[in-house]
């Protein structure tokens, strides 16, 4: 069964909408195979987003991701990655379709509520970054 990683970012955790977001995943037929709340360290955030290290927004992204707790989850189901990306909506919440997570819960392109894997290969690597295999069931 296909798996993908979801991160509910600090802005959405602070708004106390974690349950509403997780409910969207389950209502769309995705199973939450693993989930945990944690505080990323600067080293964690830099390592996770290393692919963006040369980009001008990298420093701000890292600072944002360590600004409060996050909720990381492994979502599982048929076409899990594409389904999650559809549920999230466009990166910029102003461009996100009505009813998507970002349209409903995000404030800006930076504080955009959620992260989702953008390829199956990245999903595998991102899941392994946060979860041991025995934690996923």
Swiss-Prot record:
Its cofactor is Mg(2+). It catalyses: a 2'-deoxyribonucleoside 5'-diphosphate + ATP = a 2'-deoxyribonucleoside 5'-triphosphate + ADP; a ribonucleoside 5'-diphosphate + ATP = a ribonucleoside 5'-triphosphate + ADP. One of its GO terms (biological process) is CTP biosynthetic process. ATP binds at residues 9, 57, 85, 91, 102, 112. Pfam families: NDK. GO terms for molecular function: ATP binding; metal ion binding; nucleoside diphosphate kinase activity. Its EC number is 2.7.4.6. Keywords: ATP-binding, Cytoplasm, Kinase, Magnesium, Metal-binding, Nucleotide metabolism, Nucleotide-binding, Phosphoprotein, Transferase. Its main location: cytoplasm. One of its GO terms (cellular component) is cytoplasm. It is found in: Cytoplasm. The active site is at 115 (pros-phosphohistidine intermediate). Homotetramer. Major role in the synthesis of nucleoside triphosphates other than ATP. The ATP gamma phosphate is transferred to the NDP beta phosphate via a ping-pong mechanism, using a phosphorylated active-site intermediate. Belongs to the NDK family. This is Nucleoside diphosphate kinase. The gene is ndk.
């Amino acid at each position: 069964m296909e798996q993908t990683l979801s991160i509910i970012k600090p802005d959405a955790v602070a708004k106390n909408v974690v349950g509403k977001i997780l409910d969207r995943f389950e209502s769309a037929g995705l199973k939450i195979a693993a989930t945990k709340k944690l505080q990323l360290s600067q080293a964690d955030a830099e390592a996770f987003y290393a692919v963006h290290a040369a980009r001008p927004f990298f420093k701000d992204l890292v600072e944002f991701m360590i600004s409060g707790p996050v909720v990381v989850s492994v979502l599982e189901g048929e076409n899990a990655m594409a389904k999650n990306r559809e549920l999230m909506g466009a990166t910029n919440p102003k461009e996100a379709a009505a009813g998507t997570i970002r349209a409903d819960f995000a404030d800006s392109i930076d504080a955009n509520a959620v992260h989702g894997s953008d390829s199956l290969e990245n999903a595998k690597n991102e899941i392994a970054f946060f979860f041991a295999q025995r934690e996923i069931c």
